[in-house]
Amino acid sequence: MGSGLPSKSATGHGKRIGLLSLGWGCLLLTASAACAAAPIHLASISRSHHHRLHHRHRGVGVQPNLRSTEALVLDTTSHKVLYARRADVPVPIASITKLMTTLVVSEAKQPLDEELDVTSDDRAIGRGASSRLAVGTHLSRAELFHLALMASENRAAHALARNYPGGVTACVRAMNAKARELGMIHTHFVEPTGLSSNDTSTPEDLSKLVMAASQSAVIRRYSTSRGYTIRSGRHMVAYHNTDSLVDRRSWHIVVQKTGFTNAAGHCLVMQAVIDHRTVVMVLLNSWGKYTRVADARRVAQWMKAKPGHHVIRQVASRA
């Protein structure tokens, strides 16, 4: 296809990804000078203590009834907020953290075809951490990107951070520095997987991360991949995307990431094209496994029913 990226393996096949010796220059799209000069500013939102803004344009109609506790829908062209709920409240973000991990690792421009090992250090990343990657598994850096973004593989994300120049500590430091660079003033990271409830952010901040991540061809490709199979130990292990919307032809998703912990609830962030408009959705702390996807569908249906309107509703300040 001429993208210069390592080729994807078809789902269900035990073929390793085709590795190519590539320069990172073709993988990362450089943001415009204007974007680099200043952080993205969202539409003005009231921040008075315990204040909620309920604003509705005359004749607009009913807002989407979302189940996510914190949410934001942003038009990336106009930078206008179409929908917001508790958009400036810092909360745990679970594996949405991996979007920042892969962003800073990609910017280090380490070889994608370099073979890396999954070690016991990657196993000891947190109580109850799920992973199907056996210690001793050999994977390329590209494959670790693939699994961390598509399947939210905890050991894959940790291995990427562990092999970052300076190790995990340096990677987390770079993640926080990148957050400041992007204007994510209410975001803080303590580790690279999202398993810690101390990895926190707001919907407003995460919209900036999603837009920055959308500039990376690696993140775009692997976060929207449908499936991939690897050899882990003695077994072939098939992985699938944790976001079922990538399988829907009716959805044009540019970049996405899911997350879940007990502290964070079910989370989903994405950049998608809906009704010819590019939007960022941030949906945090949904109460059910399928609620985050249902909320995304509610937003899409609302946008298609009310094209062209810019509405802000249910915005709460930090308590």
PLM-predicted stretches and their roles:
Residues 16-17, 99, 272, 278:
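Hydrophobic alpha-helical segments, especially transmembrane helices
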Residues 36, 184-188, 194-319:
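Domain-terminus/edge residues, biased toward the C-terminal soluble/receptor-binding domains
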Residues 40-204, 208-217, 274:
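Active-site-adjacent loops and short helices of periplasmic peptidoglycan-processing enzymes
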Residues 1-70, 305-319:
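N-terminal secretory targeting signals
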Residues 18, 128, 140, 167, ...:
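Secondary-structure junction/capping motif
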